[in-house]
């Protein structure tokens, strides 16, 4: 979830400046952000539905690897308003689509009794990733005059997240039985 925060907040905050630096108008950037928001609704709903039918670890791995592929394609193609709009639409579908399967995996593994607290811890990692995506984006831009390094870090983190989700066991963890007569 750290990676989700890093990727989406880096893009949400720094993409407008990236586009401006590459000669595109603010209108392209605002349209891109609007498309991300629009397609996010579709992607998040679809991820929740797919997570009820397929293993969530594969769904999460797919989302993270597709984000990395989308970024690589975006960086590898000529930057035009239409390439930005296509990228924004694809990223929108993938934007917060990690939320339903991530929370579902937490509930499956740990149960729902402490779901609010556990979801809070998971969300904290998202926020730490968000901070680092924004901060590192600005820091490296100031140091190099380019966002290239951070884009590639986002790609690498997406591949890493895809790989570490694959071995996740989605069943409840084994807990020792309570001793007889112990208060619940």
Regions found by a protein language model. Give the residues of each.
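Loop-to-transmembrane helix entry/capping segments in MFS-fold secondary transporters
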Residues: 26-27, 112-122
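A membrane-interface helix-boundary motif in multi-pass transporters
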Residues: 139-157
